[in-house]
């Protein structure tokens, strides 16, 4: 059953968190030294002190302990002053632990998953299906005592009783011959 999430209203967080302070302007973008403990999502909205959206996060730069962010302003007239603090929505941050190296236990679990042997498919479930390339064909399992061209059933495909090609060992030599029509 498919779910339709388009009708569901998404609640937007109005809680803001400090993003950082403006260092300088470079090629029409603001460069900020990040003051928040987490890293903002790219394209997340950036707010000024009056909670007005002034732009979006464009690029994230620097080391994990010294992060800088560039902001693409919506319009050039709202460019802020150096040293001004900017904000972002609290739910628009990625925890820093996602960017840190994984713990040894997680690495060991992943390695064990790679080493774990995959269960082989049950041979009985395969049956006698013909394979496309080089597999076992249906005719290859015929018993050696059967002869090719021998009709096993007395009923033909048309639904009539067919004559058997087998010699049933009749005592009369003419019994197995087809009699000509007059």
Swiss-Prot record:
Q: Record keywords: rRNA processing included?
A: yes
Q: In which broad location class does this protein mainly occur, judging by the first location in its UniProt entry? A: nucleus
Q: Name one Pfam family in it.
A: Gar1
> Can you name one GO molecular function term for this protein?
RNA binding
InterPro entries, per database record: Gar1/Naf1_Cbf5-bd_sf, H/ACA_rnp_Gar1/Naf1, Transl_B-barrel_sf
Q: Which SUPFAM superfamilies match?
A: Translation proteins
Q: Where would you find this protein in the cell?
A: Nucleus, Nucleolus
Start and end residues of each stretch annotated as Disordered: 98-182
| Keywords recorded for this protein, A-Z | Nucleus, Repeat, Ribonucleoprotein, Ribosome biogenesis, RNA-binding, rRNA processing
The GO annotation for biological process reads: pseudouridine synthesis; rRNA processing
An example Gene Ontology CC term for this record: ribonucleoprotein complex
Name the residue ranges with Basic and acidic residues bias. Answer: 100-124, 138-148, 160-182
Known role: Non-catalytic component of the H/ACA small nucleolar ribonucleoprotein (H/ACA snoRNP), which catalyzes pseudouridylation of rRNA and is required for ribosome biogenesis. This involves the isomerization of uridine such that the ribose is subsequently attached to C5, instead of the normal N1. Pseudouridine ('psi') residues may serve to stabilize the conformation of rRNAs. The H/ACA snoRNP complex also mediates pseudouridylation of other types of RNAs. The H/ACA snoRNP complex mediates pseudouridylation at position 93 in U2 snRNA.
What's this protein's family per the entry? Belongs to the GAR1 family.
Quaternary structure and partners: Component of the small nucleolar ribonucleoprotein particles containing H/ACA-type snoRNAs (H/ACA snoRNPs).
- Official protein name in the record: H/ACA ribonucleoprotein complex subunit GAR1
Q: Which organism is it from?
A: Encephalitozoon cuniculi (strain GB-M1) (Microsporidian parasite)
